[in-house]
């Protein structure tokens, strides 16, 4: 059984009911289905393949080689000593065989080995109808050829074209030296249909460590790497808000490029939810349609739904199209019902249809966009304005005019709307002309631009102003810098040191913008590149005035042989010659002489350790506005120890958080993962997670406990369990993606 791959949908963990009903193999389109942990051969007959390669499967002739042969009676021959029988791609090996020529039947009573395209086996007793390709073998050990798996059977019946039938079967994917294995599937009757890639078992039990986990009268499982329809592994978890949470997905392999999954999800405190997902891949693109429906929530007493549709396509060279639509029935949906971390921390659901062009000279972008608020902590807040539609165009790079002269153009047209609020249209364009001198050791880029923004407001009442306000501002800038480098030796190692001082002057005259609405403009997070922006805002509703000089210097120490960075550091400062008035709510203005200071540093202590520090400093307040400090040690992909600190005082809700994360193998089989996210400002744990994973050759178990803040005064917690039986079930990427997120950490920290 193989569960779905690359489906970061939900992290409900699976319980130990690994083979509850039937099991489907569903990798992503075009991907392999399953790979077993390498720790010992499952098929000991693999070494015979080179010595006895199979022939043409369509060749029905029978070839027999033996050291000795004798005719015991009329029509009956006896062959002894390394007997080899070949028919098509099937080879039969035995120390002794009897051949009944009248019926074309070969029979042996000790040490039989059969090698075929689909199934290898060893048996004590066997008969093979050579001309028909039918066989019956008793007291047999069998090994799948197209998928990891082996087992024993009291009887194996094979046919040339039809399925193989096995009686009193024990099947496992554990290595051959483990006997029955740590786990096995026990069934009275098993049918292996290699044409469909499916095995079916009747009166079956899944036994783990000698303990029967589940009994089912019928079970389907994959015997090749091809996808197949059937039940996926169940997922099970528990939380305060949902109680016991059990899901049993059914996978429908419609076609190679289309599939669907239907999932009943039982929550003891909420009721029965139905989930469905349809995926497709074709010439017009690929997409996913997803739905959740919970009739009559037992706590709220109302129906609750989720719809999601995503589509991506490349309709022509250099063009891309995208549709992304999601909708829920109420603002509390993800808090109450979702166990996917990125969903439960979402503020808005986005709905958009977009078309983009990226050519050698121009970029074009068309979009219609809407949002739905899904964060209960912001209940009552207005949603972002709709963009219905938005059209943008810009030159990809400055385009040549004459000599060193270049020009650039950026334009945007957008219509904003929001229920109960004013609507309007905005046209924004900026044309710049400049020069670019770059001689390697220095550069100079003077630029003169003019930015014009025009509005047409459908409902300007809230402003008590005109219906068509506008703003026009020239923008003058000069960006210059020097580049130095030198070779240095330290501790007998060669290094390359770089030094890059930079000077950036910006002048933008002040304009009265009080008549202009604020549709989508905000102050961004500050970083080094923001020192050289011509506007301190993101969005066209506000253009900041400026008469300022940015001085900055960057330096790096790089490995002289590989060029890999060892230490990087940057200092930057904005000195203002004129005051800048606040243009957004909750924004503070800047006076003459006020400065913005930024420092960044990163150290790479070998290939395993990275330290990063960033601070934005306010001279006037003598305090940090933003600050980030982080140290990460990661010698291998699954080994990580990290600590991060973050401070932001420029937000409507300031934050100060510390984040500790780690993942480490305790033994080759046992690994632990944990994360602790703490708010220093609120003196509160935001999220605590501890998980362990034990992984052997053919099975793995993951256990995790999580406690997290849903709202400032509401905490949820849960315990999650997932069992993986290799070959019968990799139980989705539910709890695994949950643990991966904790291991990787969140560098940006919400």
Specify the residue positions occupied by each region the protein language model found.
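Compositionally biased, proline/threonine/alanine/serine-rich low-complexity intrinsically disordered stretches
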Residues: 30-56
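A low-complexity, Ser/Thr/Gly/Pro-enriched, surface-exposed linker/loop concept
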Residues: 98-99, 106
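Interaction modules related to DNA damage response and DNA replication/repair
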Residues: 47-59, 64-66, 80-96, 109-120, ...
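Bacterial N-terminal signal peptides that target proteins for export
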Residues: 3-16
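Outer-membrane beta-barrel proteins and related beta-barrel translocases across Gram-negative bacteria
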Residues: 35-37, 65, 113, 119-138, ...
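Bacterial N-terminal signal peptides
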Residues: 14-25
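Boundary at the C-terminal end of the N-terminal hydrophobic targeting segment
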Residues: 27-32, 652
């Amino acid at each position: 059984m193989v569960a779905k791959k690359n489906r970061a949908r939900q992290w409900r963990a699976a319980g130990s009911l690994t083979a509850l009903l039937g099991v489907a193999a569903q990798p992503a389109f075009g991907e392999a289905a399953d790979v077993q942990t390498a720790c010992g051969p499952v098929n000991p007959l693999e070494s015979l393949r080179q010595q006895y390669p199979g022939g043409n499967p369509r060749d029905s002739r029978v070839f027999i080689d033996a050291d000795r042969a004798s005719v015991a009676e009329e029509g009956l021959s006896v062959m002894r000593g390394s007997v080899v029988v070949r028919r098509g791609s099937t080879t039969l090996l035995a120390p002794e065989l009897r051949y009944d020529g009248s019926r074309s039947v070969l029979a042996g009573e000790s040490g039989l080995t059969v090698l075929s395209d689909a199934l290898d086996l060893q048996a004590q007793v066997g008969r093979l109808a050579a001309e028909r390709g039918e066989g019956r073998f008793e007291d047999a050990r069998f090994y799948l050829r197209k998928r990891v798996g082996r087992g024993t059977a009291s009887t194996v019946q094979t046919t040339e074209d039809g399925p193989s039938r096995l009686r009193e079967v024990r099947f496992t994917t554990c290595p051959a030296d483990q006997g029955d294995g740590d786990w096995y599937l026990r069934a009275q009757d098993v049918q292996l249909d290699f044409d469909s890639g499916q095995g079916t078992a009747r009166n079956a039990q899944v036994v783990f460590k000698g303990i029967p986990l589940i009994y089912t009268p019928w079970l389907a499982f994959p015997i090749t790497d091809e996808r197949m329809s059937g039940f996926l592994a169940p997922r099970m978890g528990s939380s305060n808000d949902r109680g016991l949470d059990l899901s049993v997905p059914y996978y429908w392999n419609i076609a190679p490029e289309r599939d669907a999954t239907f999932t009943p999800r039982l929550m003891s405190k909420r009721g029965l939810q139905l989930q469905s997902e349809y995926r497709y891949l074709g010439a017009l693109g690929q997409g996913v349609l997803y739905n959740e429906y919970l009739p009559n929530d037992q706590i709220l007493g109302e129906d609750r739904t989720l719809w999601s549709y995503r589509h991506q396509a490349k309709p022509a060279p250099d063009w891309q199209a995208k549709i992304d639509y999601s909708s829920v029935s109420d603002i509390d949906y993800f808090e109450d019902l979702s166990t996917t971390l990125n969903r439960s921390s979402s503020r808005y659901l986005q709905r958009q249809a977009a078309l983009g062009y990226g050519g050698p000279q121009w970029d074009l972008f068309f979009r219609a966009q809407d949002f739905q608020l899904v964060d209960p902590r912001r209940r009552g807040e207005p949603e972002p304005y709709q963009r219905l539609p938005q059209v943008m165009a810009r030159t990809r790079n400055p385009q040549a005019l004459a000599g060193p002269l270049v020009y650039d153009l950026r334009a945007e047209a957008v219509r904003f709307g929001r229920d109960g609020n004013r609507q309007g249209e905005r046209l924004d364009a900026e044309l710049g002309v400049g020069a670019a001198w770059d001689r390697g050791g220095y550069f100079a880029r003077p630029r003169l631009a003019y930015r014009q923004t025009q509005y047409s407001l459908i409902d300007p009442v809230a402003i008590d102003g005109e219906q068509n306000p506008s703003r026009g501002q020239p923008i003058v800038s000069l960006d210059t810098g020097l580049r130095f480098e030198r070779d240095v030796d330290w501790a007998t190692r060669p290094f390359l040191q770089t030094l890059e001082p930079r000077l950036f002057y910006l002048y933008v005259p002040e304009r009265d913008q009080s008549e202009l609405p604020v549709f989508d403009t905000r102050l961004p997070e500050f970083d080094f590149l923001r020192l050289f922006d011509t506007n301190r805002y993101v969005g066209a509703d506000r253009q900041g005035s400026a008469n300022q000089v940015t001085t900055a210097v960057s330096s790096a120490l790089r490995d002289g042989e590989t060029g890999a960075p060892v230490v990087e550091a940057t200092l930057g400062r904005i000195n203002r010659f004129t005051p800048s008035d606040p243009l957004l709510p909750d924004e503070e203005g800047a006076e003459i002489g006020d400065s913005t200071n930024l420092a960044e540093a990163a150290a790479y202590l070998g290939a395993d350790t990275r330290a990063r520090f960033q601070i934005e400093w306010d001279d006037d307040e003598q305090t940090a506005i933003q600050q980030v400090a982080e140290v990460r040690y990661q010698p291998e992909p699954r080994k990580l120890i990290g600590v991060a600190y973050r401070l932001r005082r420029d937000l409507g809700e300031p934050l100060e958080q510390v984040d500790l994360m780690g993942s480490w193998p305790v033994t080759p089989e046992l690994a632990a993962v944990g994360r602790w996210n703490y708010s220093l400002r609120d003196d509160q744990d935001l999220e605590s997670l501890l998980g362990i994973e034990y992984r052997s050759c053919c099975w793995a178990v993951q256990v995790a406990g999580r406690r997290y803040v849903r709202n400032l005064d509401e905490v949820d917690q849960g315990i999650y369990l997932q069992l993986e039986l290799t070959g019968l079930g990799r139980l989705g990427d539910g709890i695994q993606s949950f643990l991966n997120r904790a291991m990787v950490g969140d560098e940006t920290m919400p």
